[in-house]
Amino acid sequence: NTGAAVWKIEHRHRYTDQSPQGFGFDQGYVGLIEPPFSNEGTRLTNLYWRQRLNDGKATIVAGMLDVTDFVDVYALASPWTGFMNFAFSTGSAAMFIPNDATFGIGGGGMLTDRIFLIGSIANAYTDPTEPFDTVDDFFDENEYFTSIELGLTRGHDRIYLDNAHLTLWHVDKSNRAGTPGGWGAAFNYSRALRDNALMPFIRGGYANDGGSLLEKSLSIGFGYNTFGGRDQLGVAANWGEPNEDSFGSGLDDQYTFEVFYRFQLTEQLAITPDIQYLVDPALNPDEDNLWVFGLRARLAL
């Protein structure tokens, strides 16, 4: 049983008129492309205490959190190493996600050798560039994001690779932020095959209001590790129905396709070219489809 302080400070800035995070909406697409690649400047991502219990089979975190670290997680969700489109990440774009550095508490553990449970409560509305305001807001505003997740895995050490789960979430209404309350559900089934080389997945979500991007979403795809796990190919497709409470009624359904290949050039440096094909961008009736080309570099020292 061990404890640790976890923290992360970042500086995020654009080099052009539009940051990658805004590429989608800039072209009328309801969705986010590389959400971390924004223009927020210096900001706090997390600052919390992590306590592991029961020989590492249970964990509690408390402080300023990034809830995507433990809500609706699967192995290809990270925007740093996996898919770039948010439709293939937490909640399949059909979930309200608090901003980073939100004050709260989360915990999870193995109920049996195969069944796990994860829950959290956090401040729903926060600004990571003014992170310490979230502590007062948690106690004064009473506007919360809550989640509970029940899942099945082949073992505690396989929880990120072999994972079937159902996540339920709720967000409170905020008069100050001008956002509606709501609730929803997300599910995931992913399985690592062929000595962990191949991982197919199916994921989806439903939102009843809550200010999410999509109201209904379904994603399928796979990751394939090559050269003994050094490199990785990712292929995925998504169908999404924009949230009419967020964007209005009568919008077209969107279809998203993405392919990436991550080259691990050295132990520290990875380069990932990426192609996305966006069909029927809901907020741009003049365009039937859009192409997005990306190149991501990651240096881990």
Role assignments for model-derived ranges:
Residues 1, 51-53, 64, 109-111, ...:
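Residue-level signature of outer-membrane beta-barrel architecture
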Residues 46-48, 104, 147-149, 186-188, ...:
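Membrane-embedded beta-strand positions in outer-membrane beta-barrel channels/transporters
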Residues 289-301:
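Outer-membrane beta-barrel "beta-signal"
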